[in-house]
Amino acid sequence: MHEQYTPRDIEAAAQKFWDEQQSFAVTEQPGKDTYYCLSMFPYPSGKLHMGHVRNYTIGDVIARYQRMLGKNVLQPMGWDAFGMPAENAAMKNNVAPAKWTYENIDYMKTQLKSLGLAIDWAREVTTCKPDYYRWEQWLFTRLFEKGIIYRKNGTVNWDPADQTVLANEQVIDGRGWRSGALIEKREIPMYYFRITDYADELLESLDELPGWPEQVKTMQRNWIGKSRGMEVQFPYDKASIGHEGTLKVFTTRPDTLMGATYVAVAAEHPLATQAAQGNPALQAFIDECKSGSVAEADMATQEKKGMATSLLVEHPLTGEKLPVWVANYVLMHYGDGAVMAVPAHDERDFEFAHKYNLPVKAVVRTSAGDEVGSEWQAAYGEHGQLINSAEFDGLDFAGAFDAIEAALIRKELGKSRTQFRLRDWGISRQRYWGCPIPIIHCPSCGDVPVPEDQLPVTLPENVVPDGAGSPLARMPEFYECSCPKCGAAAKRETDTMDTFVESSWYFARYASPNYDKGLVDPKAANHWLPVDQYIGGIEHAILHLLYARFFHKLMRDEGLVTSNEPFKNLLTQGMVVAETYYRVASNGGKDWFNPADVEIERDAKAKIIGARLKTDGLPVEIGGTEKMSKSKNNGVDPQSMIEAYGADTCRLFMMFASPPDMSLEWSDSGVEGASRFLRRVWRLAQAHVSQGLPGKLDVAALDDAQKVIRRAIHAAIKQASTDVGQFHKFNTAIAQVMTVMNVLEKAPQATEQDRALLQEGLEAVTLLLAPITPHISHALWQHLGHAGSVIDAAWPSVDEQALVQDSITLVVQVNGKLRGQVEMPAAASREEVEAAARSNENVLRFIDGLTIRKVIVVPGKLVNIVAN
């Protein structure tokens, strides 16, 4: 055994061994417990960042631990390889996105391997390869034929300069991120998944996921947004509108119907279009509403604007004439593109009514009273007893709901309805680097799915996009084709799919990545699925995790999987944060400096109180800790850390510095500390091994001092097993190992029994560290005399007998204050403990002259004497 700990050599040797032995290749083994551990696969951006390292280390620790429990463990890896960044990089570097993507994958794969992850690389999937997306296209055609995918017009952000559609995040202050042109809202035909058909099930089956964080389930419940309300129809005023009809609205507050003073419609609503005829000012306002972002978040924060029309509708219960307004806060694709406005009890309507001098009528008695003032109060939105509501006065919310519904049904002007906030999922993207949509547009036959024997529709990979619209739409060699039904000349769809589609089913493909007869091999999929443990960032709580759950149900309904949910347990890891440093630039902006380029000064409590740039020695501002990012220049390159300290040190620091679900603050001194600890373990093992391995430990012959050491070893095993197995608290498990190391370093090594006990301790340390620092554990296990590999060793078991104590120390309190200690046999009775406490010399001083009222004995811990 080498005297020095040399991580580079140790890690290279372990990784070579795992590769040669194919240690992590898995096959289905019926009858053996399975465990599927999956971390969210990365986008191949170019190189790993510390967030990746943390995510994949957490997954690897769990996977290796489960393997030590004797389970057949699957831990695969792949690449979420389609998407905008590749197109942007391609334009910047004048290189095809495919080339850029594949080069990044090669480099990042090398990085992942250097971390020593227990991954079955034979199952690798790359979503931009035709053998992957072919099956996505196959499923698309099946769902299109069933009507679960349909085509309709959707509102998008249109950049008139680049002639392309922009995502919401590409619209900055109403302008295109690249062209700077004012953005317009456009209606274009798009494909949609009917996810709303599954809304109820997606909501209800959240209750089948006790292994998910409550926060994530709440976020999904809110996103799905089930609400019971009322569909209310306001009859058209024939005199102003010119024909009969009704304006349909949905409200969750039908109890406030008697307080409606106007109605508002979206700019795209037919009534808005009618009102704008011959009214250029209104038409201009409608055009203004149609430009700008279609993002819901932007709509919520923008200034509320409106314009009156000359149109009126009738209140369904009173017949009162209400004015129709066009408002920018009403969305055509939400509800029915119209709202009834009750300014007294809705903040948005209140703001609008005050701005445009519209009537406010209170109809609910709230904790703020019966009147509504000139400033909005949260109380105005409360439920309460109805007032100013004719025959409905005095009713509470539930009573009013039923009574108003009955009145509307009698007039055939309304009924209760359940509505969801969730909208159908539009997946058409006018982008190049994505999965082609397998539809052919025929002048005679309409939209025709590409037949199975013509799949995949392959994306040409030698294209360099220029940013002006989709390159596919300018490639006749791609879109010119013949109709599969009638053989006439037809046009292939040039939109590609939202990249969330690929990541919605990849977890299932890992079960049979090379299967060529279908999306998944049902036998393999049902052997492994659902995933036992899924690990990823909380930022994916809604979209990715909701879409993956939806896709799992689609696959179930296609007969491909039998389970209802894809992920049994979910761990959302915290961010990796680091200090930030900057100087204010001459233009008022900030120049950010990497922590590695800054020299810091700390106070006695280790708080940073000053910082200077190493190059010029001049001060820089301290910006506090922030998530590692390029924009703040506070990232640490994992590769440089691995080269300097080794992967095991990085893994140990990541797991020790914070519980996995909390933010982790990067600390160079913490990394140094992790490295020092591994050197200590190596040093102790090397000194032990160099004297020759001892014989077997005779547990029955241990003296009291040896029993204390053995108790420390097994107490650590017990606690670490709970921490890792039940709570994923790797930081406290590592703390247990450190405690044992302190004991072992001080333990005597004079006799054969002493050395046999040290051998047991070092084996326990090696096994407890094996999932966390696998390379050093691989080497230590061999040096400690084991023929097999540590990855095939079992997790250490607790000898409960070792934890039994012959005697225990109890603290003695008088009136809750510590006044002494007594050493007692572990089996001592309550009476014996009380007698010993009362006769303790120090305790006697504090109870002298007092009357003892009560003696409380907490077995094994303390005695409290209450006296006055």
UniProtKB/Swiss-Prot annotation:
InterPro entries in alphabetical order: aa-tRNA-synth_I_CS, aa-tRNA-synth_Ia, Leu-tRNA-ligase, Leu_tRNA-synth_edit, M/V/L/I-tRNA-synth_anticd-bd, Methionyl/Leucyl_tRNA_Synth, Rossmann-like_a/b/a_fold, tRNAsynth_Ia_anticodon-bd
Record motif 'HIGH' region, residues: 42-52
**Catalytic activity from the UniProt record:** tRNA(Leu) + L-leucine + ATP = L-leucyl-tRNA(Leu) + AMP + diphosphate
A GO molecular function assigned to this protein is: leucine-tRNA ligase activity
Q: Name one GO cellular component term.
A: cytosol
Keywords for this entry?
Aminoacyl-tRNA synthetase, ATP-binding, Cytoplasm, Ligase, Nucleotide-binding, Protein biosynthesis
Which Pfam families does this UniProt record tie to the protein?
Anticodon_1 (PF08264), tRNA-synt_1 (PF00133), tRNA-synt_1_2 (PF13603), tRNA-synt_1g (PF09334)
Q: Where in the cell is it found?
A: Cytoplasm
- The kind of enzyme this is, by top-level EC class, is ligase
What's any GO biological process attached to this entry?
leucyl-tRNA aminoacylation
Q: Where is this motif: 'KMSKS' region?
A: 627-631
Q: Give the EC number.
A: 6.1.1.4
Q: Where does ATP bind?
A: 630
> Which PANTHER family does the record associate with it?
LEUCINE--TRNA LIGASE, MITOCHONDRIAL, LEUCYL-TRNA SYNTHETASE
The record's family statement is: Belongs to the class-I aminoacyl-tRNA synthetase family.
* NCBIfam families cross-referenced by the UniProt entry: leuS_bact
Task: Tell me the protein's name.
Answer: Leucine--tRNA ligase
**Organism name:** Pseudomonas putida (strain ATCC 47054 / DSM 6125 / CFBP 8728 / NCIMB 11950 / KT2440)
